[in-house]
Amino acid sequence: ALCDRLGITLAEECYSLDRVDIERSSYAHCPRPGGRAQLQAYDAAMLDVAHRLGTEAFFTGVGGDNIFQFTKSARPLVDRYLAQGIGLHLFSTLSDICRLTGANAFRVIREAAKVPRSGTQKYLWVPDERFLSKDAIAAAATSRLSHPWLEGPTDSLPGKAAHIAFLIRTQHYMDVHDRRWPTSTLHPLLSLPIIQACLAMPSWTACAGGVDRAYARRSFAADLPTETLTRSVKNGPDGFAHAIIRHHLSRIRERLLDGELAQRNILDREKLDAALKEQQIARGDDYPRILLLLDTEAWAEGWSAGSPASRQT
């Protein structure tokens, strides 16, 4: 529908297991891990389109949820109370959050009461400890990295502080472009004017009317087709991610249970062994974490080899 509205051609590609090498990291060119195996198939499809169409640059929608404050938190209610006090406007925001989340008013108010107020740290970074060994978790706790950007701002409203935290997360996307590609990758939603405009929006406007990213939807209401404007969910590569694990399960078990990370006591082999059973994979939701660890294993092997050739993609 969007391509029809804009008058541009839609290029459709399919994920292929043939384009995934679990012994190669999708972040092999980066100084830190963070990729997942399914990115290899996505990158391959992008390059196919680039070669076929003579593409010089890809414009992405990366960061949209962060910039437009996609949240189902009670923080906007706290912000509006701190900024404007009690009034009909507060009940309007309460109603918006209830409609957006499906929670009743008592649940939303209870969650709002837990939100830190001014003068305290507004957010905490909670590490994902799934499948990490006790020693690795303890080591990370005693040597936790810090940076001014990671400290919760004490002079902003709690909801806006969370918005800033969302923006910090976009740094993950900013330095992962493989410069060997024949194309550039541009993220227009992360441009400074858009960031500044969205940061200026009160947090409660992001859920106005009981819909997420409300001010972004209103801003483009005249330009987008109804199907796009009212979209609340979208498909992702979850099925393909499951297919990767099922197809390579025995090899994945070998690499994660006996690989570089396990040998360095970074992984909890017992928990991983239980998670990497066929029946558990079928019903579990740990597959993104497993694919991240799998890609990290390949990344660590590549850098441990010490040769640039070992990191070639």
Regions found by a protein language model. Give the residues of each.
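Hydrophobic alpha-helical segments, principally membrane-spanning helices and signal/leader peptides
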Residues: 46, 160, 176-178, 253, ...
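Active-site helix-to-loop segments that bind/position phosphate- or nucleotide-bearing substrates
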Residues: 294
